[in-house]
């Protein structure tokens, strides 16, 4: 039997041991970088892209690095004399080990040949230390919840860890010479020339006219699909996912915050099988229906490349972590769809809906860029458009539109005239209005709406504006 007093003492002992652990660092690498910068000031621009002052473990080294930066910002050179003089004027020379330590740094660094490698060592150690710090903060948050629910704590933990991951790849960003960019661009153009693919450079939408306007759904893009209720925004987004799943091998990931997975699957079977969805929902199927559905089921089971997550009220961090997992397990994704954006939640921003939507929008855009896949997010529209005579949506009709309009690369609205005009000449016709396209034209294309199949198809009727 383990007695409470022993356990308490043992815990206290372990706590003291943990406190004695020294976080990972490399004083030698830090000294080599600082000494190298005194030898060759021109190395500063390269080094500063890899490390910042806070990456240095030693406080004196942090102070020295900061002083170097300030001297260079003022246009002064960095050497033993200028650095020691500047530190002395600010009363910091004693804190960094006096003139003798600066002289030692300079003396013990014979060259700057490996200065970037040393900077990388400093950065790596700093990231690991930050991981330890964040892990401790997460543990403390678990012990002292301050009234926060587990969902909020998980969101805090995930976002804290993700911030470290974002910093990890900082050195990969920054200016590139036009020669490098031009070489990459010409290579891309050559690939397109050799495999034109009817002008589709992204994910084929399955709709000819939409492909002509967009060249497909492009990697890294945030795509907003918006419409008033009953226009078919979920159906349209699902059709894009279905078409992508049939045309490509990599998985399609669907986050359905509004409908359960079973309803999504019924719609998918109706669409792909061309079977009336009302008969599927009620089970009133004939032999032909079963035959059509059996063929579809066999194809879906053979490909097995559609994932549906019907969890409700997901946070951006949850969406991101789950998408990453599916991406990692399948070595890639074709497309991600979120239905719909306004049902997502950010617990820490729940008191400010505008900031909450802005964070959701920013995270989805970041996810698209990180995984290099198109992310489709469905959105509601403001009711105010119902007061207009022309009820075709425009960008400003997006609910909480500011951040959505800014972050989106492609915005598509759905308008069906028959919803507002019972005797419309355009029954069964849907207008897909491209309100924004960062790298292409805006305008309108038409699709045929087959609601009984939960499906949009290519439009073969007369064109109209």
Swiss-Prot record:
Read off the InterPro entries from this record.
Answer: AAA+_ATPase, DNA_heli_DnaB-like_N_sf, DNA_helicase_DnaB, DNA_helicase_DnaB-like_C, DNA_helicase_DnaB-like_N, DNA_helicase_N/primase_C, P-loop_NTPase
For the protein in the UniProt heading, the enzyme class is isomerase
Pfam families the record matches: DnaB (PF00772), DnaB_C (PF03796)
Please list the residue ranges annotated as the SF4 helicase domain.
196-463
- Keyword tags: ATP-binding, DNA replication, DNA-binding, Helicase, Hydrolase, Isomerase, Nucleotide-binding, Primosome
Specify whether Repeat is a keyword of the entry: no
What's its EC?
A: 5.6.2.3
Asked if the keyword Lipid metabolism belongs to this entry, the reply reads: no
Reactions catalysed, as given in the entry = Couples ATP hydrolysis with the unwinding of duplex DNA at the replication fork by translocating in the 5'-3' direction. This creates two antiparallel DNA single strands (ssDNA). The leading ssDNA polymer is the template for DNA polymerase III holoenzyme which synthesizes a continuous strand; ATP + H2O = ADP + phosphate + H(+)
Known function: The main replicative DNA helicase, it participates in initiation and elongation during chromosome replication. Travels ahead of the DNA replisome, separating dsDNA into templates for DNA synthesis. A processive ATP-dependent 5'-3' DNA helicase it has DNA-dependent ATPase activity.
Q: Its family?
A: Belongs to the helicase family. DnaB subfamily.
Q: What is this protein called?
A: Replicative DNA helicase DnaB
Q: Give the lineage.
A: Bacteria, Pseudomonadati, Pseudomonadota, Gammaproteobacteria, Enterobacterales
From the UniProt record, report the name of the gene that encodes this protein: dnaB
